[in-house]
Amino acid sequence: LRMSRGLGDVYKRQMAHKGASVCEILQNCVIFNNGTHDSVAKKEDRAKNAIYLKHGEPMLFGENNEYGLMQEGFGLKVVKLGENGITEKDILIHDAHCMDNTLQLKLALMEGPDFPIALGVIRDVEAPTYDDAVHEQIEEVSAKKKYHNFEELLMTNDTWEVK
């Protein structure tokens, strides 16, 4: 699979992201699943079967960006611009920073033939990391402790003798 459009940006965003990040690579395997990603790998099919998501931009795809994603009830639907009065203003704007991951999960789970495969950065939220939370908890507990080191403990009356 020789499709690297936007992959460099994805890697850069992953490296800059604080915390965990996941990058799914669509890799062809000629032994076990040859051609499984042809719908997005072949140049002639890629434009209609893949959507390149960029934060803050409308979710458009197709050879000339003639298709887009709209919300329909609790789901998504593919629409063609110009049909039924649909304009670019009706198309969803990608928000990778939204804390509510409902739409982002729907984008990640899209697959053909009814939907394009979402490529690019789907979700990029700032949240406390586990590591930061552990350090913060240690600092809070340490601040409340009566003794901060072993010497302070030994210099108190809270000691005992083993005989």
Task: Name each region found by the language model.
Residues 1-11:
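Single conserved hydrophobic/aromatic residue that forms the stacking wall/gate
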Residues 12-14, 38-39:
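Short low-complexity, flexible loop/linker segments enriched in glycine and/or proline
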Residues 19-24:
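A conserved active-site cap/scaffold subdomain adjacent to cofactor or substrate pockets
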Residues 27-163:
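Flexible, low-complexity linker and terminal segments
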